[in-house]
């Protein structure tokens, strides 16, 4: 189902990868807001599935570089960060 496509979480992927262009702080905040908007548009029942797919795609792009644990924790906590249900996604590390 297209509405559950992990590719619809592109801002979330950037956020999980820590790709706020130009440093931390305010930009990252805006990025997380855009990510929350993407997540809210998804049907509740497939949010975690989409988040997991997005996380695996982020890992593929990063090829295990850098802060894998941090990316995993960020991905798992995304719905909670956005104050939407379910508040936590159980993602199996790749």
Swiss-Prot record:
One GO-annotated biological process of the protein: defense response to insect
pH-dependence annotation: Optimum pH is around 6. Stable from pH 2 to 10.
Q: In which tissues is it expressed?
A: Expressed in seeds (at protein level).
Question: Function, please?
Answer: Cysteine protease inhibitor that likely functions in defense against insects by inhibiting cysteine proteases in the midgut of herbivore insects such as C.maculatus. Selectively inhibits cathepsin L, as well as papain, ficin and bromelain with lower efficiency. Shows antitumor activity, inhibiting the growth of prostate cancer cell lines PC3 and DU145, and the gastric cancer cell line Hs746T. No activity against cathepsin B or serine proteases (trypsin, human plasma kallikrein and elastase).
The UniProt family comment states: Belongs to the 2S seed storage albumins family.
Q: Where is the signal peptide?
A: none
Query: What protein name applies here?
Result: 2S albumin-like cysteine protease inhibitor
* Thermal activity profile: Thermostable. Active from 25 to 100 degrees Celsius. Retains 80% of its maximal activity after heating for 2 hours at 100 degrees and retains around 30% of its maximal activity after heating for 4 hours at 100 degrees.
> Which segments of the protein form a coiled coil according to its record?
none
Record's keyword terms, sorted: Disulfide bond, Protease inhibitor
Q: Which GO terms describe its molecular function?
A: cysteine-type endopeptidase inhibitor activity; nutrient reservoir activity
């Amino acid at each position: 189902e297209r509405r559950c496509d992990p590719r619809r979480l592109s801002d979330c992927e950037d956020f999980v990868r820590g790709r706020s262009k130009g440093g931390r702080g305010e930009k990252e905040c805006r990025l997380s807001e855009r990510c929350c908007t993407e997540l809210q548009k998804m049907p509740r029942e497939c949010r975690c599935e989409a988040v997991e797919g997005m996380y695996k795609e982020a890992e593929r792009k990063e090829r295990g570089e850098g802060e894998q644990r941090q990316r995993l924790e960020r991905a798992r906590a995304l719905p909670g960060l956005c104050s939407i249900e379910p508040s936590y996604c159980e993602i199996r590390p790749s």
